[in-house]
């Protein structure tokens, strides 16, 4: 939400805090021998200023990351295929061995 303020130093601090938090979570998942997915639903901090120099506080259409960290030894990996937000839940369900409901329109991005 900090990106919506248009305050660049606050957005930088927020990104750094999230980065540190993700590192802690991934370390815990590694110790547990688990699997973690990291993603976002939209961009915002990637464009903090509009063309005229005013604060840009809206979402952007920039691609967002979708990363898989498999510490389970199962050899899970993403296919590298371009995906969409609707593909995230099917990918996670497939990784957990759960059938993807037919109502879901996305596909698994596992290789």
Residue positions per predicted region:
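Feature captures the catalytic ectodomains and active-site-proximal regions of enzymes
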Residues: 1-111
């Amino acid at each position: 939400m900090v990106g919506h303020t248009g305050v660049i130093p606050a957005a930088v601090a927020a990104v750094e805090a999230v980065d540190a938090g993700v590192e802690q979570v991934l370390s815990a998942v590694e110790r547990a021998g688990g699997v973690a997915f990291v993603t976002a639903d939209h961009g915002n901090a990637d464009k903090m200023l509009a063309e005229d120099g005013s604060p840009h506080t809206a979402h952007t259409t920039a691609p967002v990351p979708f990363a898989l960290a498999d510490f389970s030894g199962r050899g899970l990996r993403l296919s590298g295929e371009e995906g969409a937000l609707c593909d995230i839940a099917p990918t996670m369900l497939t990784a957990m061995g759960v059938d993807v409901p037919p109502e879901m329109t996305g596909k698994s991005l596992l290789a």
